[in-house]
Amino acid sequence: MKTRLLSFLLLFLLVCSAQSQTYQPTEENLKSRQEFRDNRFGIFLHWGIYSMLATGEWTMTNKNLNYKEYAKLAGGFYPAKFDAARWVSAIKASGAKYICFTSRHHDGFSMFHTRFSDYNIVDATPFKRDILKELADECHKQGIRLHLYYSHIDWYREDAPWGRTGRGTGRPNPKGDWNSYYKFMNNQLTELLTNYGKIGAIWFDGWWDQDQNPDFDWQLPGQYAMIHRLQPACLVGNNHHQAPFAGEDIQIFERDLPGENRAGLSGQDISALPLETCETMNGMWGYKITDQDYKSTKTLIHYLVKAAGKDANLLMNIGPQPDGELPAVALERLAEVGEWMKVYGETIYGTRGGCIAPHPWGVTTQSCLLYTSPSPRDCS
C-alpha cells in the first residue's frame, strides 16, 4: 500500500512539475527581441504562383479551383526579371531593416527547394532556381534581416486537414492525415532553419482556419520548441488573432494598430511582448493587377509613426509581379519613404511607445519626441 501511495505521489509531482514548466527564452532570444523592437520597420513580400492569376493570394479558395488544375500554374512560372539584389537594395533604401518573405502560403506551393515535396520553385517550375536562397544570400550580404512567413494551411496537400477555407479545391479526404502533415511541416521548418543562414523570425499564419473546431490541436508547443532548438535567437510569431500563446516571442496585429480593431482582426489584448502590425501598401497582399489603390507616401509614413507611438513595428506589404519585379508604384513609395527616413529615421529606430496615448495631432515616444503632421520636432 505504501509503495502504491509513493508511486502515486511521485506521479503527481511529475505532472505538477510538467504543468508548471513554461517557455524560458534564451539570452540570444531576448537580445533578438530587443533588436526587433529597435528595427521598427520591415517589408512583407507575398509572392507565389498565385501572382500569375493576378487576382490575389486567396484565388485558389475564392474561386474553388481544383488543386490538381491549380498546380499546373507552376509549369508556367518563370519570373525572368527576379533580381534579389535589386529587391533588397530597394527595400534597404526605404529604411526597412528586415524582410518577411512567404516561404509557403495557403496554396501549398513552396518558394524554396524542399526535399519533402516536388511542389516547389525548383522542381515544379521551368525557372529551376531557389528564390529563397538567392534572397537569403542577398539579405545577409546587405545586412537586412530575413523573416519567413509559413502557413499552417495547405489547400493542395491531401494529408492537410480541412478547415473553413479551401473546402472546394477537390481534395478527397476532409480529415487528412494530421501526423503526416505535422511531420511534413516540421521537416520543412527544419530545412528553412538549416539551409538559409540566420533567420530572424518564423511568422506563422492560418491557426484561425480551425477556429470552428475548438478541439483541434495544432501541436504548437512542440513546433515552437523545435524552432528555438534549431535557432535559439529566432523569434516565433503567429497571426492567430489571439493573445500570445506560450512559446511565442512577438505579438502580431493584422491590418490594425495595437488597441484598435477597425478591420475586425485584432481585438486581442496587448501583451508585453514586442509588437508588430502588418498592413498592405495597396489593398491586397498578393499581386492583383486591378488593385492600383496604393496608399500615399504621407499615409504610409503616418502609419509608421503611429505604430512607433504604440510601441509597435510596421511590416508593410508588397505583392511582387509574376515576372519577378516589384510594382513600379511600390518602388516609388519605397524610395519616398526612404527619403523621409534619411532625415527622421533616428526618431523611429530604437524608440519605445510614449507615456501619452496617441492623438489625432500626433504621437509621442520614449525618445522624447513629439510627432506631428507632417514632420516630428524635438520636444525636449
Q: Which positions does each model-derived feature cover?
A:
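Bacterial N-terminal signal peptides that target proteins for export
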Residues: M1-L6
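Ordered hydrophobic segments in well-structured contexts
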Residues: L13, L370-Y371
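Mature catalytic domains of secreted/periplasmic carbohydrate-active enzymes
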Residues: Q21-L370
